[in-house]
């Protein structure tokens, strides 16, 4: 069954996230032009097949990640595979960028190999991925050199597209675009927005002193640093070293010493930037053992049942943010999509990123359909980067000049006594 692709989410100004509301259909048009003048690397990049266009995804397909990526892949395949555009049929290929050696998480060598494989396929037009921001750092430059557009349903690290003081690294994002043009877009909010929204939420709960931790990966560090920066601005005292985030060792077997240090700091809230696979279950358990009543807050990197299964009862009372709209909060046509999904999946809700996988595929399909030459990489790239007011299951998608989604929402949830967490509110942040 091919599910409806129309949904809605209200756009808002930067750092002001409004509640979601439906749009009545709307157009599915997207116009190119945001990519600028055609660079040399994008000349003569027409596919060689007379009847096939290839679209790839590169996502972690092992370990705890499958809770999200199984449904992401399902939606991408359902939206794209077998679609006919003029003389061409779209073929979709599901690539795994994880490995057993990396514990089922993304593996840099595998991600690079995936990007190189796709770059070498003359009929490849779109690369959907990555799931992890650190992986995107490796593949964006490879695909940029090959004039292949990349659309991420889940990358949230700001440095992939823009410079954010105190969060991004020197040279970012320019270093990822050796061809001097942009070939990367994402349909999800960035961590500077999510972190700031989370800090505002903590302030609204009366929290005054915070200890901030991260898993030292690109996503976790960026989100935690963003939270700490905004917390300092709004009067929450950040008591972790240097008033910023502190990395924890994901390979540690005991976080009791970390917990005692935090307890001694007098913090009344702990913020953790991490993905599930970074030993988060053990970390939560040790923190709760030392501080049963302390508030713990985190982001969408642990917004999955696998995290809760690992943390057990220690996960109860955790506050979570998601850089988008959770499936339980989509309205109008978006809710119709959720209802259809549930009907086909034993009444189970989609995972948090499922709708954003669908939206990424919708952007890709729209660009291919509207390209002057649908099997020309530059024409497809222009269509993606110039996406404007495109209806999708998460609402109207528009990309700015950096490739970031315009507007959006940050939603807040609380884990009470079981999974899934309960919706609290749509968060607002004003700088």
At which residue positions do the language-model features occur?
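Extracytoplasmic "Venus flytrap"
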Residues: 36-77, 83, 95-108, 131-132, ...
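Short, low-complexity disordered leader/linker segments with a strong preference
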Residues: 1-54, 85, 429-431
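Extracellular/periplasmic periplasmic-binding protein-like sensory domains
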Residues: 284-358, 416-429
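Beta-alpha junction/loop-to-helix N-cap segments that form part of ligand/metal-binding clefts
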Residues: 28, 40-41, 67-72, 84-171, ...
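Extracellular/periplasmic Venus flytrap/periplasmic-binding protein
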Residues: 104, 117-120, 169-290, 328-332, ...
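Segments of small-molecule ligand-sensing domains
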Residues: 343-354, 365-420
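Periplasmic-binding protein-like
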Residues: 57, 118-131, 149-154, 209-214, ...
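Solvent-exposed loop/turn segments at secondary-structure junctions
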Residues: 60-64, 97-102, 132-137, 155-160, ...
């Amino acid at each position: 069954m091919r599910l409806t692709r129309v949904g809605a989410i209200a756009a808002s100004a930067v750092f002001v996230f409004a509640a979601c509301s439906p749009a009545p259909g709307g157009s599915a048009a997207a116009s190119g032009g945001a990519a600028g003048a055609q660079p040399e690397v994008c000349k003569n990049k027409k596919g060689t097949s007379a009847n096939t266009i290839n679209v790839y995804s590169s996502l972690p397909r092992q370990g705890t990640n499958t809770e999200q990526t199984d449904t992401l892949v399902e939606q991408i395949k359902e939206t794209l595979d077998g679609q006919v555009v003029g003389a061409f049929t779209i073929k979709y290929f599901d690539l795994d960028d994880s490995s057993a050696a990396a514990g089922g998480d993304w593996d840099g060598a595998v991600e690079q190999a995936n990007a190189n494989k796709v770059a070498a396929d003359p009929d490849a037009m779109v690369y959907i991925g990555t799931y992890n921001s650190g992986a995107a750092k490796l593949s964006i430059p490879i695909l940029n050199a090959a004039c292949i557009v990349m659309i991420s349903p889940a990358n949230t690290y700001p440095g992939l597209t823009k410079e954010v003081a105190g969060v991004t690294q020197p040279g970012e994002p320019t270093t990822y675009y050796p061809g001097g043009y942009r070939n990367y877009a994402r349909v999800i909010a960035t961590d500077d927005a999510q972190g700031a929204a989370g800090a505002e939420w903590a302030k609204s709960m009366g929290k005054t002193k915070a200890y901030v931790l991260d898993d030292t990966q690109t996503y976790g560090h960026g989100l935690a640093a963003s939270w700490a920066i905004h917390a300092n601005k709004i009067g929450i005292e950040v008591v972790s070293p240097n008033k910023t985030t502190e990395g924890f060792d994901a390979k540690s077997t005991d976080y009791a010493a970390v917990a005692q240090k935090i307890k001694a700091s007098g913090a009344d809230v702990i913020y953790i930037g991490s993905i599930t696979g970074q030993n988060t279950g053990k970390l939560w358990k040790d923190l709760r053992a030392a501080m049963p009543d302390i508030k713990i807050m985190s982001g969408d990197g642990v917004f999955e049942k696998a995290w809760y299964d690992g943390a057990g009862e220690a996960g109860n009372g955790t506050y979570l943010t998601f850089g988008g709209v959770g499936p339980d909060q989509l309205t109008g046509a978006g809710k119709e999509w959720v209802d259809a999904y549930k009907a086909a999946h034993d009444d189970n809700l989609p995972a948090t990123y499922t709708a954003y996988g669908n939206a990424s595929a919708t952007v890709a399909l729209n660009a291919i359909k509207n390209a002057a030459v649908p099997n020309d990489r530059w024409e497809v790239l222009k269509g993606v980067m110039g996406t404007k007011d495109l209806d999708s299951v998460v609402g109207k998608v528009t990309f700015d000049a950096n490739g970031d989604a315009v507007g959006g929402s940050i939603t807040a949830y609380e884990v009470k006594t079981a999974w899934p967490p309960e919706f609290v509110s749509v968060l607002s942040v004003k700088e």
